[in-house]
Amino acid sequence: MGRMLTHKDLIIRLHLQGHTTLEIARQTHHNPKSVDAYLKTFDAVLILHLYRVPPALAATILGHGANLIDEYHHIMRSYLKDPEVMRDHLTARGVKLPAQALHTG
C-alpha cells in the first residue's frame, strides 16, 4: 500500500498545477495564510536542497523537525524531480538563485 496523500501534498500539488492561494484555501478548507506558509516552507526546503544542505541541517536552519523536512523532500521528489524544474519553480515564485546553486545529484 502506498503513502497517504497529506494536506501538504495536496496544497503543493494544487499550487504546482497553477491554482492560486485562494483557490487552494477554498479547496482544502485551509486559511490562505496557512497555504502560503506551506508553500514558503516548501520553497525554503527546495532552496536548501539545491545548495546541498543536508536534511538534518535544513531542519535546524528552518526551525522544523527532521520528519517534516523529510516529508517535504518526499513531496519534492514526487513533483519536481529535476533540479532545473526546481529552479524554474523557484524563479516563478520570485526567488533568484545563482547558477552554482544547481544541485545535480
Residue spans for each PLM region:
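Long, charge-rich, low-complexity intrinsically disordered regions
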Residues: 1-105
